[in-house]
Curated annotation (Swiss-Prot):
Keyword Transmembrane: no
Superkingdom as given in the UniProt entry: Eukaryota
Annotated GO CC locations: mitochondrial matrix
Compartments in which it is found: Mitochondrion matrix
InterPro entries reported for this sequence: Complex1_LYR_LYRM7, MZM1/LYRM7
GO molecular function, one term: protein folding chaperone
Subunit structure, as described in the record: Interacts with RIP1.
Protein name: Mitochondrial zinc maintenance protein 1, mitochondrial
Record gene name: MZM1
Organism: Lachancea thermotolerans (strain ATCC 56472 / CBS 6340 / NRRL Y-8284)
Protein family per UniProt: Belongs to the complex I LYR family. MZM1 subfamily.
Stated role: Assembly factor required for Rieske Fe-S protein RIP1 incorporation into the cytochrome b-c1 (CIII) complex. Functions as a chaperone, binding to this subunit within the mitochondrial matrix and stabilizing it prior to its translocation and insertion into the late CIII dimeric intermediate within the mitochondrial inner membrane. Modulates the mitochondrial matrix zinc pool.
Amino acid sequence: MSTSSMALAAYRNGLRATKVAFGQDLRMLQAARSKMREGMANPPNPELAPEQQIQHLNEVSQFLRRNIVQGKRGEGDKYTLNIHKETELGDNETIKTTKKTLVSRGGGCCGGGQGLYK
């Protein structure tokens, strides 16, 4: 596949990713697509090889699909999140592991600093 066809495929992938991430927010959708169009015309890192720029655009597209979730304010202080099938949901396993910070070992400001300078 030639570089130009790979770039076109990455650009289309990016446009689809913006639709997934910002589909219900027309203003953000237009801004994201405008920024992408500008980046294709004037690459932000011209010193990178075209293949690296294409890879970067594909990574940005993947990030948009998996990690951007839009929220809409409902009544009161409640928000509705637009979580879709491609949204990456963490399993929170890192929260369950014991932290190795000063506070969790009885040191730091709240623990009185016991054994801080052993």
